[in-house]
């Protein structure tokens, strides 16, 4: 009976370890893709805005556009916003 409990205990530990390993591998891959997307869109926005846009606003816009699609008009509108206007626009 004790070897049965020992085997069951080891099996449960292995299942828990496998579940944690699989859970941990999913998130970083998405974060890497999202970060790469934000960087590409931020660079494109910076060029489209002739390097005159507020960097925080452009970075936030890039992040939003990576999460859900946004139009070119929305992207270009971020060129003229400042950080304070962006925070009041969200309210």
UniProtKB/Swiss-Prot annotation:
Keywords: Cleavage on pair of basic residues, Disulfide bond, Secreted, Signal. The gene is ins-11. Disulfide bonds join 37-66, 49-79, 65-70. This is Probable insulin-like peptide gamma-type 1. One of its GO terms (cellular component) is extracellular region. Belongs to the insulin family. The keyword Cytoplasm does not apply. Residues 1-26 form the signal peptide. The keyword Signal applies. One of its GO terms (biological process) is innate immune response. It is found in: Secreted. Its main location: secreted.
């Amino acid at each position: 009976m004790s070897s049965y409990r020992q085997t069951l205990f080891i099996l449960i530990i292995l299942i828990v370890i496998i579940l944690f390993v699989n859970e941990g591998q999913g998130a970083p891959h998405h974060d890497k893709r999202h970060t790469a997307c934000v960087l590409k869109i931020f660079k494109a926005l910076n060029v489209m805005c002739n390097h005159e846009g507020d960097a925080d606003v452009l970075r936030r816009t890039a992040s939003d556009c990576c999460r859900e699609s946004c139009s070119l008009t929305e992207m270009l509108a971020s060129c003229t916003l400042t950080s304070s206007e962006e925070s009041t626009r969200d309210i």
